[in-house]
């Protein structure tokens, strides 16, 4: 047999001894099986139990037929190849394999020059990702385009086809990575739940303009809540989303978000507008966040958050992190970072959101118009020099205004070896105030030295517990600081407050944060930490810490209205934390008044997470006379596919529920159903209820109101159920 025009019998060895009248019996060359040549001019590789040349230019193959060309593989019971037309006909158990798609059918007719043709009764499956379906036929238009008639699509298994998309005509354009469906209906458990006469969607992960899945929910304060986002893929590096929102009790809210990512700039900007019939006023929100890289060392940016009224977030959001906001930031800034110095220029102000039901108003922070900062660090042999300096103009509508200039150079000498460290440090804190005319003293100067000595050692030993090898450490630490008294009663409070007493705060020279107060200090902090580290994994199983501060002189510098300290010791601090087992973690801390024998502050936290979809969290927070809260949350399987979620955050001090949440989730294998009820305190004596109901179809999208952000924030360790059970 000679090679015919346009056709190559390759990957075959001819067994001449078996040649008979019935035709030639051919064997495969396994080394060449699966070989492909790119392009339309690539040869066709053919193998079969039987191959006949029935006429001039006609080749027929029967029995386990395999034909391969340029990455396309054809399998069938019978195949006819017309070398003159360069076309193929295949019948009986036809299978077409491509890199990302596998299709079976009854018959195939295709022109190998134009890739046009038809496959009858196709059943298709994507390779490497979920997704399958069938159709009445596939019409191949050219190399990149084909269409399916009367098609279906689903990510469900054949045994449990709970949902599928029914499409009258589906056009696929691989050149543009776009699919277009005509007269598509979504059926769930046999019931049509959604219909569209036309829809266009991207193939793969590419972005494409179009309507996104709507969200539907309900809240007590706003009623029925429907959002229909429209996505605009303007360019590969910037896009926009328009999200009209219908609130049955308030009206239609219009919102839009614009994002961009350039080589030297990025930003996210959002605006919202609502003509609120319930509040009888127009309401709006603006959030602008942009940053720019001016050169390798210098960046600039702006942040602008503003809303029309104090209750905007409380009325229109369901996230506690949003409804609890009290100050919105507005600032522009420029920073530069170099090897031994850095600088910053910033202008900043705030919008304060008041709670009309609160007994006391929220204090409005000072604006910094502007704020300039310079920092430096340099090493000279064993000595380390640092400089912190700033100049700020503080503005406020009702309080004393003025300018503060501050400089704090320090020199330290760290002495470190394998057993411990000793670090003496000396600094000079200098501050100048130029106040407005309403102040008692227009110009104030404050200078004082600050000396500290930090030291610690580390002891360790091997130990064995419950058959596991550990390394136990004992780490005592002693910290001394001295700063003389300076009268600061005439200095206003621009940005200064008292640091929360904590383990980290005990090793700082100043108990105040901000530059308006420098404490007088002659004090010694003594602490010890012990760690239990698993030898094989290096995992810290347990850490125990104790610490206390001792004062050698009475306190004289305080904040206005705060009495000075009378005791010569601080409260005792204790903390226990660690991953005590594979599933259990604890984080606890206590502040204990040794003079009166009472607990001043207490934080207890524990979490149990034996596996995905199994999480229990417990927290208790107590601050004497101000706070006492319990916080319990969990996600846990209730059956083979059922999961329950809840959170209970209660304030005993205020005798109210801060946040309550209860939800159920069902995993159907290729879909998930979630329903969540949430009650959230939005004001001192008010709360709002929200109901979420969402159907997620794997590989297709989500329908309904989205509770995922609420669940992930309210239930630490939460995992969507369809991320736990593998999709069939």
Swiss-Prot record:
Keyword Signal (UniProt): yes
Cited Pfam families: LptD, LptD_2
Domain of life: Bacteria
Keywords attached to this entry: Cell outer membrane, Membrane, Signal
Keyword Membrane tagged: yes
Signal peptide: 1-21
GO CC annotation, single: cell outer membrane
Subcellular location: Cell outer membrane
Transmembrane parts of this sequence: none
One Gene Ontology biological process: lipopolysaccharide transport
PANTHER family in the record: LPS-ASSEMBLY PROTEIN, LPS-ASSEMBLY PROTEIN LPTD
Subunit details: Component of the lipopolysaccharide transport and assembly complex. Interacts with LptE and LptA.
Biological function: Together with LptE, is involved in the assembly of lipopolysaccharide (LPS) at the surface of the outer membrane.
Similarity field: Belongs to the LptD family.
Stated name of the protein: LPS-assembly protein LptD
Naturally occurring in which organism (per UniProt): Thiobacillus denitrificans (strain ATCC 25259 / T1)
Classification lineage: Bacteria, Pseudomonadati, Pseudomonadota, Betaproteobacteria, Nitrosomonadales
């Amino acid at each position: 047999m000679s090679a015919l025009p346009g056709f190559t019998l390759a990957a075959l060895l001819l067994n001449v001894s078996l040649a008979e009248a019935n035709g030639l019996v051919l064997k495969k060359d396994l080394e060449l099986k699966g070989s492909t040549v790119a392009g339309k001019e690539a040869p066709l590789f053919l193998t079969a139990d039987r191959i006949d040349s029935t006429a001039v230019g006609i080749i027929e193959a029967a029995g386990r037929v395999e034909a391969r060309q340029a990455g396309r593989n054809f399998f069938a019971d019978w195949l006819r190849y017309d070398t003159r037309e360069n076309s193929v006909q295949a019948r009986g158990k036809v299978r077409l394999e491509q890199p990302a798609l596998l299709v079976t059918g009854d018959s195939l007719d295709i022109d190998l020059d134009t890739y046009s043709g038809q496959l009858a009764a196709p059943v298709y499956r994507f390779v490497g990702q979920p997704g399958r379906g069938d159709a009445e036929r596939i019409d191949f238009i050219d190399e990149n385009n084909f269409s399916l008639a009367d098609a279906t699509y689903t990510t469900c298994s054949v045994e449990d086809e709970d949902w599928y998309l029914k499409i009258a005509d589906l056009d696929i354009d691989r050149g543009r990575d776009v699919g277009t469906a005509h007269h598509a209906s979504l059926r769930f458990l046999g019931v049509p739940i959604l219909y569209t006469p036309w829809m266009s969607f991207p193939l793969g992960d590419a972005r494409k303009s179009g309507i996104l899945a709507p969200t539907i929910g309900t809240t007590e304060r706003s009623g029925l809540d429907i959002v229909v986002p429209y996505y605009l893929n303007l360019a590969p590096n910037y896009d926009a989303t328009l999200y009209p929102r219908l609130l049955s009790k308030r009206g239609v809210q219009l919102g839009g978000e614009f994002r961009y990512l350039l080589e030297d700039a990025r930003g996210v900007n959002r605006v919202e507008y609502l003509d609120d019939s319930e509040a009888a006023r127009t309401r709006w929100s603006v959030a602008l966040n942009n940053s720019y890289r001016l050169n390798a060392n210098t960046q600039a940016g702006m942040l602008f958050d503003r809303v029309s009224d104090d209750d905007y977030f409380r009325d229109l959001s369901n996230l506690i992190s949003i409804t609890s906001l009290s100050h919105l930031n507005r600032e522009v800034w420029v920073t530069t970072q170099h090897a031994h110095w850095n600088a910053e220029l910033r202008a900043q102000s705030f919008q304060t959101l008041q709670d009309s039901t609160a007994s006391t108003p929220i204090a409005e922070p000072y604006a910094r118009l502007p704020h300039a900062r310079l920092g430096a660090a340099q090493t000279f042999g064993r000595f380390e020099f640092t400089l912190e300096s700033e100049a700020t103009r503080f503005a406020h509508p009702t309080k004393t205004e003025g300018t503060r200039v501050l400089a704090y150079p320090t020199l330290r000498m760290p002495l470190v070896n394998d057993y411990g460290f000793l670090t003496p440090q000396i600094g000079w804190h200098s501050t100048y105030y130029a106040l407005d005319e309403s102040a008692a003293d227009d110009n104030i100067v404050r200078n004082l030295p600050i000396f500290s000595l930090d030291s610690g050692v580390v002891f360790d030993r091997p130990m064995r517990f419950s058959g596991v090898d550990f390394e136990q450490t004992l780490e005592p630490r002693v910290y001394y600081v001295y700063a003389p008294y300076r009268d600061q009663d005439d200095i206003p409070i621009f940005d200064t407050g008292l640091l929360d007493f904590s383990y980290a705060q005990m090793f700082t020279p100043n108990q105040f944060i901000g530059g308006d107060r420098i404490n007088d200090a002659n004090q010694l902090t003594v602490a010890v930490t012990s760690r239990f580290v698993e030898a094989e994994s290096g995992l810290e199983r347990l850490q125990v810490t104790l610490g206390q501060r001792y004062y050698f002189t009475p306190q004289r510098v305080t904040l206005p209205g705060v009495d000075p300290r009378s005791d010569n010791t601080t409260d005792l601090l204790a903390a226990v934390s660690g991953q005590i087992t594979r599933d259990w973690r604890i984080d606890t801390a206590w502040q204990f008044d040794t003079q009166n024998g009472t607990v001043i502050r207490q934080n207890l936290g524990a979490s149990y997470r034996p596996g995905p979809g199994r999480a229990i969290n417990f927290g208790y927070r107590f601050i004497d006379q101000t706070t006492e809260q319990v916080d319990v949350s969990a996600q846990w399987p209730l059956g083979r596919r059922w999961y329950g979620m809840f959170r209970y955050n209660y304030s005993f001090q205020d005798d109210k529920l801060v946040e309550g949440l209860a939800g159920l989730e069902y995993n159907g294998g290729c879909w998930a159903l979630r329903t969540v009820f949430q009650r959230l305190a939005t004001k001192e004596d008010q709360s709002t209820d929200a109901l979420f109901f969402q159907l997620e179809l794997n590989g297709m999208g989500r329908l309904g109101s989205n509770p995922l952000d609420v669940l992930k924030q309210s239930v630490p360790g939460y995992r969507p159920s369809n991320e736990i059970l593998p999709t069939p």
